[in-house]
Amino acid sequence: IRRQRQMCIRDRFMLGAKAVQMGTHFVATEESIVHENYKNAIIKAKDIDSRVTGRSTGHPVRALRNQMTKKYLDLEKNGASFEELEHLTLGGLRKAVVDGDVTNGSVMAGQSAAMVKEIMSCKDLIQKLVSETDALIGGKGFYE
């Protein structure tokens, strides 16, 4: 899995990217104020565990699969109104982030959540990413 993350970052740089999005990984750091249940849900996630809800409303959101996403996708599939969908998700992020309800709350996370395997400090995460990517790319100086 670590190799997959390294390759993913390297490949994007080789295609001309100047940066990669790492929000999900930083949510699961020691410094993040989200509930421990949220962090643990990310760490336990498999590569098939994220779902996109809200396509029908024009406001897509990627979140980890749970009861809330299942209900939302069922409602969306059956043509529920914007108001019905809004009612289901109202306060959903707070439920997950503050209350730790990762079953009924909105556990927003990117496609790469499965690559997050441990809670570490932001400093350690950045150092690890830089050293792993440098090793793959071929040494220092790539980022300058």
Regions found by a protein language model. Give the residues of each.
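Single conserved hydrophobic/aromatic residue that forms the stacking wall/gate
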Residues: I1-I9
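Conserved active-site-proximal phosphate/metal-binding subdomains
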Residues: R10-E144
